[in-house]
Amino acid sequence: MKKVLFLLLACTAVAFAAETNAPVEQEAINVWIKAFSVLAAGLGLGVAALGGAIGMGNTAAATIAGTARNPGLGPKLMTTMFIALAMIEAQVIYALVIALIALYANPFIVLQ
């Protein structure tokens, strides 16, 4: 146990004694942040678009089924459907805005 503790202490001392080049390290961190921002933007927008498409499909199917059961309610159902589709599409647009912020105005990137 003493050998392991001594080895850990020796490695820690070497790590703390090493000189660091902060601008180079920050640039490397910025590269990783940019890479993960691209991944997050693509994945987030893809999931939002998939969820929006599923929601719109279910909304249209329910409206068509309701109109088939009661044709007299068709115009009211269509109005309600268009409002629901606008709300669903707004969620996808919000995801697009967040993705664009992550790509072009990332607050986590430190400028030098």
Swiss-Prot record:
Gene Ontology CC: plasma membrane; proton-transporting ATP synthase complex; proton-transporting two-sector ATPase complex, proton-transporting domain
Site entry (Reversibly protonated during proton transport), positions: 89
Record-level Gene Ontology MF annotations: lipid binding; proton-transporting ATP synthase activity, rotational mechanism
Ranges annotated as spanning the membrane: 36-56, 81-101
Keyword field contains Transmembrane helix: yes
Principal subcellular localisation of the protein: membrane
CDD domains, alphabetized: ATP-synt_Fo_c
UniProt subcellular location: Cell inner membrane
Keyword Transport carried by entry: yes
Membrane topology of the entry: Multi-pass membrane protein
Family to which this protein belongs: Belongs to the ATPase C chain family.
Subunit structure as annotated in this protein's UniProt entry: F-type ATPases have 2 components, F(1) - the catalytic core - and F(0) - the membrane proton channel. F(1) has five subunits: alpha(3), beta(3), gamma(1), delta(1), epsilon(1). F(0) has three main subunits: a(1), b(2) and c(10-14). The alpha and beta chains form an alternating ring which encloses part of the gamma chain. F(1) is attached to F(0) by a central stalk formed by the gamma and epsilon chains, while a peripheral stalk is formed by the delta and b chains.
NCBIfam families: ATP_synt_c, PRK08482.1
Protein name: ATP synthase subunit c
